[in-house]
């Protein structure tokens, strides 16, 4: 019954009569199962744009989805404007800082050529 609610085809097993008494011999009925899969494929193609159940990492309203999106907060807040505080005044951009390693100083490097000759 739960498989019908979720949209999965139910599993039908038929025990075949055998001369040996064995409980491990059971086969699925191919005719009825193919009928269920045919109906299932038709129903999924018409409603493929809407997922049946949308939960997990991508759901921003669950705790796992909040952690995945790096968003910390209530999963389903009641009042969205509550607790935000007054609006902040936009701050003008700061002037660019001078890099302490960048300067216009040039250093003369003397290379001893005798080290390279063999």
Curated annotation (Swiss-Prot):
<dbReference type="InterPro" id="IPR044695">
    <property type="entry name" value="Ribosomal_bTHXc/bTHXc_plant"/>
</dbReference>
<dbReference type="GO" id="GO:1990904">
    <property type="term" value="C:ribonucleoprotein complex"/>
</dbReference>
<keyword id="KW-0934">Plastid</keyword>
<dbReference type="GO" id="GO:0009570">
    <property type="term" value="C:chloroplast stroma"/>
</dbReference>
<keyword id="KW-0689">Ribosomal protein</keyword>
<protein>
    <recommendedName>
        <fullName>Small ribosomal subunit protein bTHXc</fullName>
    </recommendedName>
</protein>
<keyword id="KW-0809">Transit peptide</keyword>
<feature type="modified residue" description="Phosphoserine">
    <location>
        <position position="117"/>
    </location>
</feature>
<comment type="similarity">
    <text>Belongs to the bacterial ribosomal protein bTHX family.</text>
</comment>
<keyword id="KW-0150">Chloroplast</keyword>
<feature type="region of interest" description="Disordered">
    <location>
        <begin position="61"/>
        <end position="118"/>
    </location>
</feature>
<dbReference type="GO" id="GO:0005840">
    <property type="term" value="C:ribosome"/>
</dbReference>
<keyword id="KW-0597">Phosphoprotein</keyword>
<dbReference type="GO" id="GO:0003729">
    <property type="term" value="F:mRNA binding"/>
</dbReference>
<keyword id="KW-0687">Ribonucleoprotein</keyword>
<dbReference type="GO" id="GO:0009941">
    <property type="term" value="C:chloroplast envelope"/>
</dbReference>
<comment type="subunit">
    <text>Part of the 30S ribosomal subunit.</text>
</comment>
<dbReference type="GO" id="GO:0005783">
    <property type="term" value="C:endoplasmic reticulum"/>
</dbReference>
<feature type="compositionally biased region" description="Basic and acidic residues">
    <location>
        <begin position="96"/>
        <end position="111"/>
    </location>
</feature>
<dbReference type="GO" id="GO:0009507">
    <property type="term" value="C:chloroplast"/>
</dbReference>
<dbReference type="InterPro" id="IPR030826">
    <property type="entry name" value="Ribosomal_bTHX/bTHXc/bTHXm"/>
</dbReference>
<feature type="transit peptide" description="Chloroplast">
    <location>
        <begin position="1"/>
        <end position="55"/>
    </location>
</feature>
<dbReference type="Pfam" id="PF17067">
    <property type="entry name" value="RPS31"/>
</dbReference>
<dbReference type="GO" id="GO:0032544">
    <property type="term" value="P:plastid translation"/>
</dbReference>
């Amino acid at each position: 019954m739960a498989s019908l609610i979720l949209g999965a085809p139910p599993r039908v097993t038929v025990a075949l009569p055998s001369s040996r008494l064995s409980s491990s011999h059971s086969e699925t009925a191919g005719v009825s199962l193919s009928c269920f899969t045919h109906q299932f494929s038709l129903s999924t193609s018409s409603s493929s744009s809407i997922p049946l159940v949308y939960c997990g990492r991508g759901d921003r309203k669950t705790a796992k989805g909040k952690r995945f999106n790096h968003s910390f907060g209530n999963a389903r807040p009641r009042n969205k404007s509550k607790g935000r505080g007054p609006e902040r005044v936009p701050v003008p951009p700061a002037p660019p800082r001078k890099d302490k390693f960048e300067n216009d100083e040039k250093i003369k490097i003397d290379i001893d050529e005798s080290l390279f000759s063999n």
